[in-house]
Amino acid sequence: SGLTLFDSFNHSLTTLSTGGFSTFNSSVSNLSQQSKLIINVFMYLAGISFILLLRTFKSRSLKEFYKSTEFKFYTSIVLMSSALFFAKTYSISTGIGESINDAFFTSLTLITTTGFTNLNYENWNINYRTYILGLMFLGGMAGSTAGGIKTIRVIALLKSVRNEIRKIFYPNAIFKIRMSKSILPEKMIESVQTFFILYVAIFVLGTFALSISINTFSDPISFEGILSAVASAMNNIGPGLSEVGPVENYYFLDSSSKIILSIL
């Protein structure tokens, strides 16, 4: 792949742990396409539940993947995001293969919260940047090394909201939430809802605290930069948007702002 044994070893550790640190100042943007392809594969695996991987290995059958609602949701988001990024990055000069590789890399580094820097998506339009901000919250599957909310909680919340809407039209009906053919108990749904309420509350408070700190002790930055910095800190990603984007860093922030982000 063109890397030394030392660099390969370090990148393998930070990929599987979804840590995202690199031995290069430019992160992985200057690595060969072969190296990025290898990192892509293991970022994708790092975002999958290790219990599911173990079951698949023991059964020696891919049926375990097909049975998992969470795996199908996770993979669908990766494919959809990669397709959107490919539509943005594709050009005749780079070639279709390189564009596909870069698109998958960008989606995986965000969804799995690895945080490697590959493309400068800061120059993309507001629609793409908003979508990227949303991906920063998602995270991989439960039981993986990825950070974020985790896809199983997102699925449970979406199905819970769907059931509440159904109850408006069918007030006497009883709706159950299924996950991979298993019915989720009500206590689990309540815990997921509580998690989201606390998560949103912490995000709002963190954004408010960081805004005050930056505007008091540092040079003011955009609201987009503040939002993405809080999202990045809460979900263990690293890069954000705007002033803390993929080719920037947090060096310019004052000590109090860094403490707030560290707590988050």
List each model region and its residues.
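Membrane-proximal intracellular helices of multi-pass ion channels
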Residues: 1-264
